[in-house]
Every structure is written in C-alpha cells, then in structure tokens.
Amino acid sequence: MPRRRVIGQRKILPDPKFKSELLAKFVNIVMVDGKKSTAEKIVYGALELMAEKSGKDHLAVFEEALENIRPSVEVKSRRVGGSTYQVPVEVRPVRRNALAMRWLVEAARKRGEKSMAQRLANEMLDASENKGTSVKKREDVHRMADANKAFAHYRW
C-alpha cells in the first residue's frame, strides 16, 4: 500500500438559497453533465411546488421524505467456500443519505409528469406520506435483508 498521506473528504458548501448542506448534495445528485444551475432550478422549483401543494415548509417536507426513504440495513454479497451469500449489514449514516437521495431522483425520473421539477415534487410528497416508488425501494431492500438474516453471522 502507498504510504502517502490520506486525503480528507472535500467539504461541500451549503446551497445558496436555504443554507442546507443536504440540499447542496441533492442538487449535485440531480445534476446531469455538470449543469449545476439547471439542477438548482429543478430542485428549487420542485421545493416551491411541494410547499405550495402541502402548505408546509420547503425543507421540512424534504427532510421528512428523505427520512422515509433512508435504509437502515442493506445486503452485501460475500463469497464463502464457493457460494455467494447475501449478508445483511447496517448502513452508515452518510451512505443512508446518499442512497435515499439517489433513489428519490431515480424514482422521479421514471415518473410521467411533464417537467422534472413536477416529478421531483410529487415523488417527495409521496415519500413524505410513506408511499411512492422510492419508499417501495427501501422496503424491498429491508425485505431482502430480513430474508437473509440467517447469514448475518458472516459479517465482516
């Protein structure tokens, strides 16, 4: 292994409008081909639509939606003596957020509404009410982990 110094993780700047680091990360996940200003328009537009429909605070609904999508356990493949087991492992907090945001954007992209802002807003509203594709994804991951609970002792 190289003996160079370990490079620390880059500090992400909070987004300019709401001063939220989580929202800045979300904008980066929505971003395609480096078009950050377009991604910001989409995210801020979605937050406006969401606040309009729900009558709640922008960030409150966003946080609630993410909370309902965050997985607590996932399965990782592990080879033991020629066979591969799906071993349930706990998800680290940073990865929880990353997975939740990624699943939210993936689910929004698959929706049928006209604009991406509308899709994102509706998916976040659904997620905040514990329904929608992104919440289903989390439940599928949890179900997989539950089904493979017998292999939990193979953790590393």
UniProtKB/Swiss-Prot annotation:
One of the primary rRNA binding proteins, it binds directly to 16S rRNA where it nucleates assembly of the head domain of the 30S subunit. Is located at the subunit interface close to the decoding center, probably blocks exit of the E-site tRNA. This is Small ribosomal subunit protein uS7. CDD domains: uS7_Bacteria. Disulfide bonds: none annotated. It comes from Aliivibrio salmonicida (strain LFI1238) (Vibrio salmonicida (strain LFI1238)). Pfam families: Ribosomal_S7. Gene3D superfamilies: Ribosomal protein S7 domain (1.10.455.10). Part of the 30S ribosomal subunit. Contacts proteins S9 and S11. It comes from the Bacteria. Keywords: Ribonucleoprotein, Ribosomal protein, RNA-binding, rRNA-binding, tRNA-binding. Belongs to the universal ribosomal protein uS7 family. One of its GO terms (biological process) is translation. The gene is rpsG. One of its GO terms (cellular component) is small ribosomal subunit. GO terms for molecular function: rRNA binding; structural constituent of ribosome; tRNA binding.
